[in-house]
Regions:
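Glycine-centered small-residue hotspots that permit tight backbone geometry or close packing
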Residues: 14, 34-35, 44, 153
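Conserved N-terminal alpha-helix of the aminotransferase class I/II PLP-enzyme fold
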Residues: 39-73
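Phosphate/diphosphate ligand-binding glycine-rich loop within oxidoreductases
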Residues: 19, 29, 33, 38-42
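PLP-dependent class I/II
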Residues: 1-9, 15-30, 63-362
Length: 362
């Protein structure tokens, strides 16, 4: 709708604005030059699976067996897809926070299952056990825990995660933990809920956000063998295997690029502080994000527009694009998502335009 606009400032981007690290790109080039261009094992090369397990062991204290408890996928999106297609069936329920990234609900519905959203707007966007418990029924099959969250940037503390894990320990309910932003946490070290409840947790991760590799399409699914041996069958008949060239680049990213995310994270923290101060000075109510690179901003009551109309008027009048909150379920209505995955100069120009626009309503 807005891509054709000249002089557009886009705060809609859901990917890092940094290039893939040079050493990672070179590993991909070397894979081509060395003719590493054939199918790999369905679950991915064993060297990459070992590197992935070693990475999450050192970073998050997780213990997975490379031969049987990790699958290399075509991005985190495929990992989510094959997990749901394995564990869901007609009439089962999946509990999700609202607002939430829109990529889960269609897959749940395609399986004939029922998405059950929990409104977390009045809980500082925190998807805690207290919020979850009232929605659990005998049909509940899975709880989706995306943290840090897209679109809110809010994460969960070690204590909050342990409460959820302890409650679910004796229940026949899976946890799908989407931890794709785990390397982009700002104020606290990321804790995986699998460290408390490995046997019922399917961990989704990947390199799109941590190493700015969105187009390489490399994700990881970690789970106990009794779960992965079923998911692997779906993956096998879905895509055969992940891209062989990208797998070589991914191995380089996880080994030689073990801490590559730190450079990006330092810059994101600076941007977060700048954007937070600018938005609050304009009178917006915002929850400061714990990670990722998004603000989920409440539209002031003085502006009598729904989120879509607000975003449309904003882009038409100022050439600043944001994502309407309604894109993130009905519980995103009344908000908009602003991505700070862009330069400080771009942020300053765009926020100056936004401030001028907001003043018209006061």
């Amino acid at each position: 709708m807005v891509a054709h606009m000249e002089d557009l400032i886009s705060f809609t981007i859901g990917q890092p604005d940094f290039p893939t690290p040079e050493h990672v790109k070179n590993a991909g080039i070397a894979a081509i030059d060395n003719d590493f261009t054939s199918y790999t094992h369905n679950a991915g090369t064993i060297e990459l699976r070992k590197a992935a397990c070693d990475f999450v062991a050192k970073k998050y204290g997780l213990d997975y067996v490379p031969e049987s408890e990790v699958i290399v996928t075509m991005g985190a999106s495929e990992a989510i897809d094959i997990a749901f297609r394995t564990i869901l069936a007609e009439g089962l329920e999946v509990i999700l926070p609202g607002p939430i990234y829109p990529g889960y609900e269609p897959i749940i519905q395609m399986m004939g299952a029922v998405p059950v959203h929990v409104d977390i707007r009045e809980n500082q966007f925190r998807f805690t056990l207290e919020m979850i418990k009232p929605y659990i029924t005998d049909k509940t099959r899975c709880i989706v825990l995306p943290y840090p969250s897209n679109p809110t940037g809010v994460s969960l503390s070690k204590e909050e995660l342990k409460e959820i894990a302890d409650f679910l320990k004796d229940k026949d309910i899976f946890i799908l933990a989407d931890e794709i932003y785990s390397e982009l946490t700002f104020d606290q070290k990321h804790v995986s809920i699998a460290s408390f409840l490995k046997e019922k947790t399917i961990v989704i991760n990947g390199l799109s956000k941590s190493h700015s590799m969105t187009g390489w399409r490399i994700g990881f699914l970690f789970a106990p063998e009794n779960i992965t041996n079923h998911i692997l069958k779906v993956h096998q008949y879905n895509v055969s295997c992940a891209n062989s060239i990208a797998q070589k680049a991914a191995y380089e990213a996880l080994t030689a690029g073990f801490d590559d995310a730190l450079t990006m994270k330092k810059e994101y923290i600076k941007r977060r502080e700048y954007v937070y101060n600018r938005l609050t000075s304009m009178g917006f109510y915002v929850v400061k994000p714990d990670g990722a690179f998004y603000f989920f901003v409440k539209i002031p009551k003085s502006i009598p527009l729904n989120s879509f109309d607000f975003a449309l008027k904003l882009v038409n009048e100022t050439k600043v694009a944001v994502v309407p909150g309604s894109a993130f379920s009905n519980y995103g209505e009344g908000y908009f998502r602003l991505s700070f995955a862009c330069s400080m100069e771009t942020l300053e120009i765009g926020l100056n335009r936004m401030e001028h626009y907001i003043k018209k309503w006061s």
